[in-house]
Swiss-Prot record:
NCBIfam families: lgt (TIGR00544)
Compartment list: Cell inner membrane
Enzyme class: transferase
InterPro entries tied to this protein: Lgt
GO biological process: lipoprotein biosynthetic process
The protein, known as: Phosphatidylglycerol--prolipoprotein diacylglyceryl transferase
Keywords recorded for this protein, A-Z: Cell inner membrane, Cell membrane, Membrane, Transferase, Transmembrane, Transmembrane helix
Name of one Pfam family that matches: LGT
Membrane topology note: Multi-pass membrane protein
Length: 301
């Protein structure tokens, strides 16, 4: 059944401050990561680190996600706008976060924290990797609630009508449905069954399922057994790269522009290195040690 997206992206207001669902999804993701990470710490999955140490790590990882995600979006998807108006970097309430930028930010934060703790960086990355998909899933749900990052037009019965989406897939930059008629008229047309040809793939939900639920289950089960260094990180990079590359085929490209061949998107270009890195990390894991967990009472940091 075709669904008309009519969800208010604002969860509630505190005086002049409007709290968006997308921000709450970020908080839910970080909260879930803390709960799951605490469980792994108690199982001794990060040698020599206790819950206080993990809380410290998570704080810096959160900073890496937010700062890296915003800077990455400006560099990868809105560089021209950033050059025209550098202050756009700080207008986070207008939206615009990049997974690949957030990933770089997290890796930099983990590298700094690992160096300070005198730990191997990839022991920490392997520990964190199973915690990330939950946040990715919540983030994609936030994208769906916000009615952004929609998919291409579809004739499938589960399509979603996004009033903010363009009226067709090409050309880029044309008017959205809400620019032509008001929302009351949109609801009337929807009830009369006149908007079916404007339905789009709910690509945000596809990503929430693949990058969130599926990746979490696979990585969580895979990491329950001690694995060689690099193995969990490699599996994360490989799965995300493949899933993101595939979903991009039914997702509208950022800014409505394909990078090459009339079908290749910037998201696919940024995901290809992750696939290569994932395979390389698997190769490294074949010649790396397996670190056995240390029970929580024995940890010191």
């Amino acid at each position: 059944m075709i669904y008309l997206h009519a969800i208010d992206p604002i969860a509630f207001s505190l005086g002049p401050v409007k709290v968006h669902w997308y921000g709450l999804m970020y908080l839910a993701g970080f909260g879930a990561a803390w709960c799951l990470g605490r469980q792994r710490i108690q199982a001794g999955r990060l040698l020599g680190v206790n819950i206080d140490g993990f809380s410290d790590l998570l704080f810096y990882a959160m900073m890496g996600v937010v700062l890296g995600g915003r800077v990455g979006y400006m560099l990868f998807y809105a560089f021209h706008d950033f050059l025209q108006e550098p202050l756009l970097l700080f207008r986070v309430w207008e939206g615009g976060m990049s997974f690949h930028g957030g990933l770089i930010g997290v890796l930099l934060a983990v590298a700094w924290w690992s160096r300070r703790q005198r730990m191997h960086m990839f022991d920490v990355v392997d520990f964190c990797a199973p915690l990330v998909p939950v946040g990715l899933g919540f983030g994609r749900l936030g994208n769906f609630i916000g009615g952004e990052l929609w998919g291409k037009l579809t004739h499938n019965g589960w399509g979603v009508i996004f009033p903010r989406a363009p009226l067709s897939d090409v050309p880029a930059g044309q008017l959205a449905m809400q620019d032509v008629i008001n929302f009351v008229q949109i609801q009337e047309h929807y009830a009369a069954g006149l908007l079916g040809h404007y339905a789009r793939h709910p690509s945000q939900l596809y990503e929430a399922f693949l990058e969130g639920l599926v990746m979490f289950i696979v990585l969580w089960l895979f990491s329950r057994k001690p694995r060689p260094r690099y193995a969990v990180s490699g599996l994360f990079a490989l799965l995300y790269g493949v899933f993101r590359f595939l979903v991009e085929f039914v997702r509208m490209p950022d800014n409505g522009v394909y990078v090459a061949f009339g079908w290749l998107t910037r998201g696919q270009i940024l995901s290809l290195p992750l696939i290569v890195i994932g395979l390389f990390l698997f190769w490294l894991s074949c010649r790396s040690p397996v670190l056995q967990p240390v029970p929580a009472p024995e940890v010191a940091k």
